[in-house]
Amino acid sequence: DDLQEIDFIISLGGDGTLLDAVTFVGDKEIPILGINYGRLGFLASIVRDEIHSAIKALVKRTFMIDKRSLVHLDANMPLFKGICYGLNEFTIHKKDTSPMIKIHTYLNGEFLNTYWADGLIVATPTGSTGYSLSCNGPVVFPDSASFVITPVSPHNLNIRPLVVPDDSVISFEVEGRTDGFLCTLDSRR
């Protein structure tokens, strides 16, 4: 509710700082300008010598907005301090030396698959070039309205990444010999 009067947010840092800003904006559709003062500037793409022109474009409202899909998480346990939006991906992953886990996956209430794997990634198009890509997921255009479901080290050779519409409700039940799994949202645990 405190964000209702905000026209835009300026993020000073790297991509990690911009991802933190996204968690506070959530689904409020407030534009974020990422100025790169950090190490990685894929998302925070404005470099120091472009700051003046970027601020000028904000003031004159002559900027373009890239719309990006977000992943939103609802869980039956408290996660991420109640800040459940991510720009890159959501993951379920086994902990440390825990054995492989079974992830029963449902798409819009219908059973999709049970993944026997080290984990599962649900990536947005923005996140498709990160962790999901390193697990053989496809690169998806940023403006495509989709999510990528990518298994991490699956036990079955026939299991491949799957692209689904971003308005899908994806549900999971995790089963393992122990409670040795964790969830992440844009690298937050």
Where in this protein do the model-derived segments appear?
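Short aromatic-centered micro-motifs
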Residues: 105, 127, 183
